[in-house]
Amino acid sequence: NLENFDHKVFLDGAKIAFETIINSFNNGDKSTLKGLLTGDVYKSFEKAIDEKKINPEYQFYSLTIEKIEDVIIENAIIKITVRFLSEQFKNNDESTVIKKQDLWTFEKPIKSKDPNWLLSST
């Protein structure tokens, strides 16, 4: 329901989802990912985990910026694209922090009463 949409609440949830998804992916935690991703995104994450394309030596450090970039309504689905700027470090060495920028799209049916959104694009 868009009438009650609160962008701050949405961004707070997106931040938590971002951190959870990054950490779950890096740890190969497919069960957590399954509940946070659309089917297609889950398949690509699952494939990367299975093919050991993940790089667990990088760990999430902090999220510095999250900003709504775009909102699209398509076929009764609302899609919100968020820009994240995060920092990650290598091999438990916080002196090796790298900055990463990501655009992620979250979606859910407009009429859904479920407060949760699914990651549909990275």
Predicted stretch roles:
Residues N1-F60:
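Core segments of small alpha/beta cavity-forming domains
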Residues K79-T81, N92-T122:
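Short beta-strand edge/turn micro-motifs at domain boundaries
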